[in-house]
Each structure stands twice: as structure tokens, then as C-alpha cells.
Amino acid sequence: MTAEQILEGQVFLVDKPFDWTSFQAINKIKFKLKKEFKFKKIKVGHAGTLDPKATGLLVVCTGRATKKISEIQDVPKEYWAEIKIGVQTESYDTEKPEIFPTDISHITEDFVTEVLRKFLGEITQKPPIFSAIKIDGERAYDLARAGASVEMKSRKTTIHYIKDIQIEFPYVRFLVGCSKGTYIRSLAHDIGQELGVGAYLTQLRRTKIGEYSVEEASSNFLSNEFLFSEI
């Protein structure tokens, strides 16, 4: 890979580490590219944010390839998710402490599978209040952390499939394919509400964005060994 090719425009696949924001990952990529190729400036962007607590695929575009970002953002995504039932958190993930513990001794595997099927197709969900969505010019998570009352608007999204279901109470794991803009944290929360015992997202890994797979990230030019070796 040459400096000219990167400036002209390339698409790279990166496996984002846990507890990194997508913004931090992009900054790291810029730093590494500038250091490696002596760039003074380089345009770098990604096609779809991942929460800090999530790992997995970031599609990174450089140079003129950044024009492809909006097109890539529109394609379906796939995630591996783990949820914990019988308890909730304010953030719908592990960022906030557990609240509202509920007995789950009456919950069966068949009931969980039945509930998961209800979320196939077009659904309506509310994004978590701890999200990057802007409300009157401010990020929802900034308002929530400041103690402000935050009302999130419902949005429609599509769940294409939920498969490879593994149940080891209180944990439920599955692969989910979904449309652009789906919040898996909200899906976890809503599954818990439908079960009647609450739930939150304990692990999330993005495995695919359209035709791109996280399995390809380890062998492409911007490998994690190259990018994150100096963390």
C-alpha cells in the first residue's frame, strides 16, 4: 500500500477495541497513517458508529473514498449480542449499574424464543437516553448525565433475523441482522419488557456491515496489531 493509494481513497476494515469510542479509533488511525506515511493531512472517516462498550467492525474510508461513507452506512448490519434478563440499567448496557432485579425462575427457553420471534420485521423502538442523538443541539447523553429529563422519539427499524440463539439463564445470546439506525441496546431493553422481567445488553460485537465482515479486519492493511500496538 502506497501513500498515493491512501490519499486517492481506500476502504479498510478495523476491529474496534472495547472501551474505545469510534472517534478515538479514527484519531488513532489518522495518527498511525501520518506517522507511517509522513502525511501532513489525511481525510479519514467511518461508516457507522459503535458504542464504546461494543467491539467489532468499523469500515474506515480514506481520501476520496470518504464519499462512499453515506452509501455504506445505508446497508444492513449484523451483530453478536449477549443480554442479561431479570435486571435492567439506565443506559441499557453495562455503563450504568444494575437496577430492578426481578425473579426469572418462571421464564422458560421456549418463552424466550417466542418473544425473540416477535421482534422480527419492522419494529418501533426508542433510542437509549444515553446515546449520541442530538436534542435541540445537545447530545442526549450529555443531557442525561446532567440530570435533565430526556424524551426520546420513537423510530421505525427492521430486524431481518435473530438466529444462533444460545440460552444460559440469566444470559441470552444471538446473532441479529438489522437495518441502519437500529439500537441493539434498545432491542435488549424491549426484549426484557416483553419478557416481563427486564433485560440489558452485556456484550455487543458488530460482525458485518453489508458485504464487509469483521473476520477480514485482521488480515487487511490497517490491522489491529498495527493500529493499537501503542495503546
Language-model segment annotations:
Residues 1-231:
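Catalytic/RNA-binding core of pseudouridine synthases
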